[in-house]
Swiss-Prot record:
UniProt entry keywords in alphabetical sequence: Endoplasmic reticulum, Protein transport, Signal, Translocation, Transport
Superkingdom, taxonomy of origin: Eukaryota
Species of origin: Debaryomyces hansenii (strain ATCC 36239 / CBS 767 / BCRC 21394 / JCM 1990 / NBRC 0083 / IGC 2968)
Protein role: Required for protein translocation and folding in the endoplasmic reticulum (ER). Functions as a nucleotide exchange factor for the ER lumenal chaperone KAR2.
Homology family: Belongs to the SIL1 family.
Keyword Transport listed: yes
High-level lineage: Eukaryota, Fungi, Dikarya, Ascomycota, Saccharomycotina
Gene3D superfamilies: Leucine-rich Repeat Variant (1.25.10.10)
The name this protein goes by in its record: Nucleotide exchange factor SIL1
């Protein structure tokens, strides 16, 4: 029995597209609405079919899709990979009936179960064929030569050759297969980290971090490779770099890498566990005020995807959702964490309050919520009377912080004229 490749493709698509769509399309996902037409809404995550569809502004593209540029209208389009369009290999697949005897009418007869089993076997073989690398030899040579250049680069080496190699890897790292190849060998990512440390040119550093982020984005296999093949210093270096005077474009790339790593629940359990006293959330909170707008947006996207921005009341949620300003989202997050006892220690309390004061001092348009001001009034009174429970003994640093909190209540969040009366009452 012969099954044409078109027929088999139909069977494959019937069996395979549904699970693909169920994992790609999330009915609870975020929607994007056109600013000039609020009724024109579409999923933030692109929902593919077997037909070419235009990728709308702001949509995220899941990994594993065919993407092209429509030369007629210059719009980007994407669709699910269709096995029937594969041009390599035979145009048909053979399914041979088992011949147990030479009986004329029955020699080629198969039960429905036998036919189904054999078709499933052919489907399995077909999927294995589809899973093989589609990377051309030329691309692979370019990939390997570029990787070799990065791995053999030493401080003071040929920057032009390095830049060319990085450009090649930037182009290839967007492909899911090349992303996996880049991460399978632990020495490749380690070499990229070494290059980022050894070169002074920020353009070259930015290229390195862009390669890392592109190879990990929407690529869980690549993320798994990195988490298995790299040690903790890889992550530590990323967070350390955020807390330097590096350019904002580099910090944005690093946040993209961290964001990609949060696809993995094991990574989140270790680094973003709310019960962890050294949670990486605090590192992100600490650097936020020093970032520029695009990096601030990317940082808040990380917190949002980690589901850390919930807990506000309905009015606050509406305000957060309607605000495109990351500073406003950041402020709401810190206000809620402080007022609703969402901090784990006195040190975390100080960090959150100081950073909230800093961002409100930077942007006078930010306004505290009524609930936060009511909490702050009680907190300031409690601390001014020395009735606040501490993690340890009351120190001079604690006393200074309590005074700063009282001042911030009026100067930063309230009426500065009220500070004089508050200080007089305290005396």
């Amino acid at each position: 029995m012969k099954l044409s490749k078109g027929v088999l493709s139909s069977i494959l698509l019937t069996l395979l597209i549904k699970p693909i769509e169920s994992s790609i399309v999330n009915t609870d996902g975020e929607l994007i609405c056109a600013p000039n037409n609020p009724t024109d809404c579409y999923p933030k995550i692109f929902e593919p079919t077997t037909e070419w569809q235009t990728i709308r502004e702001g949509q995220d593209i899941p990994a594993g899709l065919h993407v092209r540029l429509n030369m007629e209208n210059l719009a980007r389009e994407a669709k699910i990979l269709d096995p029937s369009e594969e041009t390599e290999g035979s145009s048909e697949l053979m399914v041979n009936a088992e011949q147990n005897n030479d009986n004329g009418d029955n020699s080629h007869q198969m039960t429905n179960e036998d036919q189904a089993n054999e078709i499933q076997q052919k489907i399995k073989e077909f999927k294995q064929t589809q899973g093989k690398s589609k990377v051309s030899t030329v691309d692979l040579n370019d990939f390997q030569s570029s990787v070799d250049e990065v791995q053999h680069y030493r401080e003071g080496g040929d920057a032009n050759r390095l830049s060319t190699a990085l450009d090649t890897l930037i182009d290839l790292s967007h492909d899911i297969e090349f992303g996996v190849k880049l991460t399978q060998d632990s020495s490749v990512f380690r070499s990229l980290v070494d290059v980022s440390k050894s070169v002074q040119d920020e353009d070259l550093q930015e290229k390195v971090y862009r390669i890392m982020g592109s190879s990990l984005r929407n690529n869980p296999d690549a993320v798994n490779h990195v988490l298995k093949n790299q040690d903790a210093t890889f992550v530590e270096c990323l967070f350390d770099k955020l807390d330097t005077d590096a350019s904002d474009v580099i910090k944005k790339r690093i946040l993209g890498i961290i964001h990609a790593l949060t696809q993995n629940s094991h990574f989140n359990a270790k680094y973003f566990n709310s019960n962890n006293a050294n949670s990486a959330v605090d590192s992100l909170i600490s650097v936020f005020p020093s970032l520029e707008s695009q990096s601030q947006t990317r940082l808040m996207n990380i917190l949002e995807d980690l589901k850390l921005l919930g807990g506000a009341n309905s009015n606050e949620k509406r305000a957060i959702e309607e605000s495109a300003d990351p500073k406003s989202q950041y402020s709401h997050f810190l206000q809620h964490s402080l007022a609703d006892s969402g901090v784990a220690s006195e040190d975390q309390f100080k960090l959150y309050f100081n950073k909230l004061s800093e961002v409100h001092s930077q942007d006078k348009s930010l306004k505290p919520s009524k609930a936060f001001m009511e909490w702050l009034s009680k907190e300031a009174e409690l601390r001014s009377k020395g009735n606040k429970e501490r993690d340890s003994s009351y120190t001079e640093e604690d006393r200074q912080f309590d005074q700063d909190l009282l001042r911030a209540r009026h100067v930063v969040f309230g009426n500065p004229m009220g500070l004089r009366k508050a200080l007089a009452d305290e005396l």
